[in-house]
Amino acid sequence: MFPVVWRNTARADLRQIITDIAAENPGAARRLKIRLETVVLPLSEHPYLYRTSDRIPGLREIVAHPNYIVLYRVTSSSIEIVNVVHARRQFPI
């Protein structure tokens, strides 16, 4: 079982996404935040659950929402959540 660790870059991405959405729709922002934070939970026991990234070597991708992708890396001791990106605007990073 691996710990899931959010890097500062991923936390900053998440914070910015939620802030932007909350300006227009606070309820949608809360729901998306919950979704993005919970979609990574199975990684602790199943680190290879999601596909390898064709765009960024060494990373894996979770399409957590039609517009948002969570990028993560499996290391020898943990799962690192690296970035959360908008599928159209910020990808590839």
Where are these regions (language model features)?
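Absolute protein N-terminus
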Residues: 1-2, 93
